[in-house]
A protein has these predicted regions:
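Auxiliary alpha/beta "docking" domains used to position bulky ligands
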Residues: 1-194
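Iron-sulfur cluster-binding cysteine motifs and their immediate structural context
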Residues: 32, 195-205
């Protein structure tokens, strides 16, 4: 019998995420056809050689396209974000912080444990910038934010100084994620950065 995540269960998970310190939380089906745009964009990026010396991007392309290679039977992605602080300097703000991989992973584990408690037989896989998944696309489709002109995920109310954490799960969403994910932003388009309007802060600052 397939494990399913109902709207009621998702609200329970959202409460756990809130208590764990995740400032935004949403969900997306892994078979959402809108993910095709992200996959096509990544294919074009690799084909053009834009990865430069980051050859691992090309080497993990197949895994990025098929999350079943990371978690067999994966049906959904639960996405959470945390904001980080720091001073403006030559060192990136996220690098001034404690290791976000560990911090976000620990908080996601609280949610993942709840998933496993509520879905007998359900499995989870936590990804915090260490697994080849389209986490930014997941976050956008989950209604958490949009892709800015700077290429980063921009979360209304938090900006782009956020880190994304994802829980892949074999639990299938039995509700419309758009009705439950909060706060909700507009669905991504082929030009998601249009939401930036005429803003050039990423270039001018």
């Amino acid at each position: 019998m397939e494990a399913t995540i109902s709207a009621e269960i998702f609200r329970d998970l959202t409460a756990v995420a809130d208590e764990a310190g995740l400032l935004r939380f949403g969900a997306v089906r892994l078979d959402d056809p809108r993910l095709d745009h992200s996959r096509a964009a990544f294919e074009a990026f690799i084909a053009a050689g834009h990865q430069g010396e980051m050859q691992f991007l090309a080497h993990t392309k197949t895994m990025r396209e098929d999350t079943n290679l990371l978690l067999p039977g994966a049906q959904s992605a639960l996405v959470g974000v945390m904001a980080y602080a720091g001073e403006s300097s030559a060192v990136a703000r996220y690098a001034q912080w404690a290791d976000y991989h560990t911090i976000v992973h620990r908080r996601l584990e609280l949610v993942a444990k709840r998933v496993r408690d509520l879905l007998p037989g359900g499995e989870t896989k936590i990804c915090v910038d260490t697994k080849p998944i389209p986490e930014r696309a997941f976050a956008m489709l989950a209604g958490i934010g949009f892709q800015g002109k700077n290429g980063c995920l921009i979360v209304p109310g938090l900006g782009s100084y956020v880190v994304i954490g994802t829980i892949l799960t074999t639990g299938a969403l039995a509700f419309d994620p758009a009705s439950e994910s909060r706060p909700r932003t507009s669905p991504p388009t082929a030009r998601p950065w249009d939401a930036c309007g005429s803003c050039r802060a990423w270039l001018d600052d």
